[in-house]
A protein has these predicted regions:
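Positively charged, small/polar-rich N-terminal and surface patches that mediate targeting and assembly
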Residues: 1-134
Length: 134
């Protein structure tokens, strides 16, 4: 599992967190994250690109992207609203995995594994759509 490092491709033109093509899954502990990553790897659902985000990483790298924009770009605010949810959970010690989304079938298989561990939120970032996977 890779450590997360924010990249421009994970941001909107406004600079807000929006990792298109990824599932963003928050779990209550590092133990749950490791259990999930192991299940994904053993089922060949992890291509080695799954990223771990500790609560500190979420607070330091993801949270500051909310509200970076000025008034020059329109937005419905969904991106910032999601980041605020992530912030609240990170403050409680939750961490996250970012998993490549792939096809609908791949996503279903990943979510079958996600549901084997306690998880707090699961979102799939697609082009122009954040899909709630709960």
């Amino acid at each position: 599992m890779k450590d997360f490092k924010i990249a421009n491709r994970m941001l909107t033109i406004r600079g807000e967190f929006y990792p298109t093509g990824f599932l963003f899954v928050m779990v209550p502990s590092l133990e749950a994250a490791n259990t999930l990553e192991s299940a994904l790897r053993s089922s060949h659902l992890d291509d080695g690109d799954t990223m771990l985000l500790t609560s500190e990483t979420i607070l330091e790298q993801i949270v500051p992207t909310a509200g970076r924009h000025g008034d020059n770009f329109p937005s419905v605010g969904t991106e910032s609203a999601m980041v605020h949810k992530y912030r609240r959970l990170a403050l409680e010690g939750h961490c996250a995995l970012m998993i490549k989304g792939g096809s609908a079938e791949h996503t279903r298989q990943v979510m079958d594994k996600v549901r084997t561990v306690p998880f707090s939120i699961a979102e799939k970032y697609r082009f122009l759509v954040i899909e709630d996977m709960d």
